[in-house]
Amino acid sequence: MYSSPLCLTQDEFHPFIEALLPHVRAFAYTWFNLQARKRKYFKKHEKRMSKDEERAVKDELLGEKPEVKQKWASRLLAKLRKDIRPECREDFVLSITGKKAPGCVLSNPDQKGKMRRIDCLRQADKVWRLDLVMVILFKGIPLESTDGERLVKAAQCGHPVLCVQPHHIGVAVKELDLYLAYFVRERDAEQSGSPRTGMGSDQEDSKPITLDTTDFQESFVTSGVFSVTELIQVSRTPVVTGTGPNFSLGELQGHLAYDLNPASTGLRRTLPSTSSSGSKRHKSGSMEEDVDTSPGGDYYTSPSSPTSSSRNWTEDMEGGISSPVKKTEMDKSPFNSPSPQDSPRLSSFTQHHRPVIAVHSGIARSPHPSSALHFPTTSILPQTASTYFPHTAIRYPPHLNPQDPLKDLVSLACDPASQQPGPLNGSGQLKMPSHCLSAQMLAPPPPGLPRLALPPATKPATTSEGGATSPTSPSYSPPDTSPANRSFVGLGPRDPAGIYQAQSWYLG
């Protein structure tokens, strides 16, 4: 399901995933993979792992690269999103992020109407109940795949059979668990030298209790390789911060569209350029990250775009200034992944004048890839304007066009029969009917091709200072027209209108 790069890109960059990723515990990656390693070892050798082997696997998983853990968490969150009913996804995100009181989150049932089970690793033969996965992911509780009967739904849960809300799921503590907890607390109290507190009433605390360590060791055998302190520490560490060196919190905040710090809305996402997954994210382009559709047909617009960097999840779900775009249309855009050889003008345009598309090419070319990019918190585009052209994947805000809005850019108001190119003049210039072309629609051709000639008008066209001339009536230029009388659409690299006209060439 996730073997194709397209599917990976769509799933890993969904706003649903980016909002929940900071709340996933790093322990979940270690725990799920450790269980899979132990199971694989037992099937291969027909015996259980030794303590030393299991401890080595645990240390290896704990020291895994952060981008690997985040990629795994993104895939798992994508699976969970598809198993949650579309009408419950927004409430689920808001409740996990603390923006809304927890409510029931219903999952899609299996064929028998019960809780579904999913595999949490690629090509894994073990399946886990959805509610078990939720508790491990967002609470960091070390549960086995057979511990589904230990889960208890809260009293306020109205759908205990299909609800996967972590705040509605608790773990039943048996007498054996309480008994073991007593010995753990006693041992911690002895090691720290502090008196034991909170074990009962004051009268019970005043009585001396002797701890028979020998009897405890004879009755119980520790099967795990986590110590109490280590288990609590790793189970409380988020997957986005439970990492080694070269992965600071600032980079993580820049990577996430939903920042850990709500006030820092100007940070853009970055990833270390040394990781393979990071290069894939840059290479895959940023346009398929911004928008995705749910099975119900709803569009989600990523707040990583400049127009929505200051909007919350609810505004993204309701829709804002930037209209959603299909990925098939985005891939046609020549600005999807600019190469390092792009001109400075193109780079500056893609970083400052794209209304919907978030660009990562600047990050890849940055001399300091480990530092997060800072952008102004205010939106580049006017927040009140909504007159984008809806006919194509790339929409331009009104402030990029100093002239009047284009009437119909995609059809050009031309009859197909009248779009046949005219004869070539002596200089090899191609003549086009002036009723099909205007200075606002024309743009410089790609390098290596002759420039299009703009036929002069029969009447002198009025020209505003800094604006482009527009012919008033159709006419043709004879082949012997002198070069001084020919008008060409050629703009200097510093002309601000050149940026806009360079775009219209790709929309033709």
From Swiss-Prot:
Name the InterPro entries on file. Answer: CTF/NFI, CTF/NFI_DNA-bd-dom, CTF/NFI_DNA-bd_CS, CTF/NFI_DNA-bd_N, MAD_homology1_Dwarfin-type
Give residue numbers for the modification (Asymmetric dimethylarginine): 365, 395
Domain remarks in the Swiss-Prot or TrEMBL record: The 9aaTAD motif is a transactivation domain present in a large number of yeast and animal transcription factors.
Keyword vocabulary terms for this entry: Acetylation, Activator, DNA replication, DNA-binding, Methylation, Nucleus, Phosphoprotein, Transcription, Transcription regulation
Region forming the signal peptide: none
Biased region (Polar residues) positions are 334-348
Q: Which GO terms describe its biological process?
A: DNA replication; negative regulation of transcription by RNA polymerase II; odontogenesis of dentin-containing tooth; positive regulation of transcription by RNA polymerase II; regulation of transcription by RNA polymerase II; transcription by RNA polymerase II
Q: Where the protein is mainly located, per its record? A: nucleus
Q: What is this protein called?
A: Nuclear factor 1 C-type
Please list the residues that carry the modification Phosphoserine.
Answer: 194, 294, 302, 304-305, 323, 333, 337, 339, 343, 475, 477, 487
Q: Name one GO molecular function term.
A: RNA polymerase II cis-regulatory region sequence-specific DNA binding
Q: Which family does it belong to?
A: Belongs to the CTF/NF-I family.
> Could you tell me which residues carry N-acetylmethionine?
1
Q: How does it assemble?
A: Binds DNA as a homodimer.
Q: Which organism is it from?
A: Homo sapiens (Human)
* Chain intervals for the UniProt region annotation (Disordered): 190-209, 267-348, 438-495
Omega-N-methylarginine (modified residue): where? 365, 451
Its subcellular locations are:
Nucleus
Q: Where is this motif: 9aaTAD?
A: 404-412
